[in-house]
Amino acid sequence: MRSLHILLVITASLLASLAVSAEADPSTRTANVVENNKDKSRFLRDGGTTEAQTDEERATITLGDKVVSDKAATKDLLERLLALGTPLKTVQKEFLNMPLIKTFAELSKHPNWRALDKYERMQWQKLNEGQTLTYMRVGDRSYSKEKAQEQLLRWVAQKKTVKSVYDDLQIEGFARNTDAARLNWRAYNMYDKWFTAASQMQRNPQQYAKFGTGYHSEQKTTEVFEKWAMEGTHIKSVIKTLNLNNKSASEMANNENFPALLKYVKLYLDFKPFRDLNAKSRLQARRPIS
């Protein structure tokens, strides 16, 4: 308890000094927080776009209107609090200066919401070591972050509207503190970014994708992708080939290879009947003739 008190004092002092420093010297002022999540009803657009949001993984700590703790510093603080076994409500109230009795929709507007959400996930992973953290749930099916990304990419390739995904992920329950909305909000934000990026994509057909030996034209890329799709090369492998692995949703959406990834996902889906037919033919060929 004494260790927690000392950490609280140090943190409060650090945040206050950083805030004063940023206010006193404009040259050292940190960037303002990118507009936080608004009430999810504002994102109801039937195939439309949404304003850019801060990335779901980039938790920071804010005091007033200044970011006073970057991603790395925030992670370090949260790890220290986790090691001390600090309760979630204590982190929320004492370290993140967030009200305790609020709906998810109201809390999501607070600049420290992502830091709170990150700490909650860190707590779960510590208590459930070795288990995969559920990132998205649709109906009775649960998805890890990797599998959720693949499913969301499929929906983008199929041009599934933001409104439809909003409904499937039950985000309307955010204001009622439903478990589904609380779990799925990151996946919804990820889809919103990708759908928006897909609707605005423009690529040079002569330098359509960069992989392997360098840039390839759209025609060459399509030829290679069709071969891979026919062979059943998994989407995860192509994400790695296009150097899109280990990137946030925003980084992927802004990457020059994102249009190519969506092209492959579409081809992968389109070629599934042919892969299934080939698999059936190979199975029949292996059966002994009676």
Swiss-Prot record:
Residues 33-56 are annotated as: Disordered. Residues 36-45 have a biased composition (Basic and acidic residues). GO terms for cellular component: extracellular region; host cell cytoplasm; host cell nucleolus; host cytoskeleton. Residues 224-247 are annotated as: W3 motif. A motif (RxLR-dEER) lies at residues 42-58. The keyword Ligase does not apply. Residues 118-141 are annotated as: W1 motif. Residues 249-270 are annotated as: Y motif. It is found in: Secreted; Host cytoplasm; Host nucleus; Host nucleus, Host nucleolus. Glycans are attached at residue 246. Keywords: Glycoprotein, Host cytoplasm, Host cytoskeleton, Host nucleus, Secreted, Signal. Its main location: secreted. Secreted effector that acts as an elicitor of hypersensitive response (HR) specifically on plants carrying defense protein R4, through its interaction with this protein. Oomycete Avh family proteins have a modular structure with an N-terminal signal peptide (SP), an RXLR-dEER domain and a C-terminus with a variable number of modules that consist of W, Y and L motifs after highly conserved residues. The C-ter of Avr4 contains 3 W motifs, 1 Y motif but no L motif. The RXLR-dEER motif functions as a host targeting signal (HTS). The region containing the W2 motif, in combination with either the W1 or W3 motif, triggers a necrotic response in host plants carrying the resistance gene R4. Belongs to the RxLR effector family. This is RxLR effector protein Avr4. It comes from Phytophthora mirabilis. The gene is Avh4.
